[in-house]
């Protein structure tokens, strides 16, 4: 009987499901600013095509960012080339001018979900446009990134 328990303990760990990892990719923005005519493009990385995921945009900025909000247009492009366009408004500072994101020194980071409960075929590519009214070149942003993580519940 003890031999059966020991054998089961050795075999069962081999049946464990490998954990699905989160992935992130960050793009460093030019020090001269992000031009509104130049979108950023991301190709999300997925570990398991049968799971559903959450996509989150993260932005890092410094004290030279001159606005309270960051307005973005996010195109989520599916495998069949269908485009799901959404507007994203990231509130980077409160009404008193205090930065809302986490960070240290002169850099701050804030992340907001842009898609939840999607399959890999629903989001093959993500294109992000900055749409700040009256602003062709946006200064003070250092990086923009896409974080892909599996949803907790299927």
Predicted regions and their residues:
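Noncatalytic modules at the cell exterior or secretory-pathway interfaces
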Residues: 50-57, 116-133
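C-terminal motif of bacterial Sec signal peptides marking the signal peptidase cleavage site
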Residues: 11-14
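Bacterial signal peptide processing site
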Residues: 16-19
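An anionic, turn-rich surface loop/hairpin at beta-sheet edges
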Residues: 87-117
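Post-signal peptide N-terminal segment of mature Sec-exported envelope proteins
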Residues: 23-45
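Exposed low-complexity, polar/acidic, P/S/T/G-rich flexible segments that act as propeptides
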Residues: 72-77, 133-154
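Short acidic/polar inter-strand loop motif in beta-rich domains
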Residues: 61-64, 109-112, 119, 130-141
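Contiguous beta-strand segments within globular domains
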Residues: 41-59, 67-68
């Amino acid at each position: 009987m003890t031999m059966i328990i020991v054998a089961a303990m050795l075999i069962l760990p081999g049946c464990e499901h490998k954990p699905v990892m989160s992935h992130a990719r960050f793009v460093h923005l030019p020090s001269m600013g992000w031009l509104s005519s130049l979108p950023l493009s991301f190709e999300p990385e997925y570990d398991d095509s049968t799971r559903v995921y959450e996509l989150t945009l993260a932005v890092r900025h410094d004290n030279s960012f001159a606005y309270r909000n960051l307005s973005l247009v996010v195109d989520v492009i599916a495998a069949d080339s269908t485009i799901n366009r959404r507007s994203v408004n990231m509130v980077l500072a409160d009404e008193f001018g205090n930065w809302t994101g986490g960070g240290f020194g002169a850099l701050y980071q804030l992340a907001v979900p842009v898609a939840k409960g999607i399959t890999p075929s629903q989001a093959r590519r993500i294109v992000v446009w900055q749409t700040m009214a009256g602003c062709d070149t946006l200064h003070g942003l250092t990086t923009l990134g896409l974080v892909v993580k599996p949803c907790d519940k299927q």
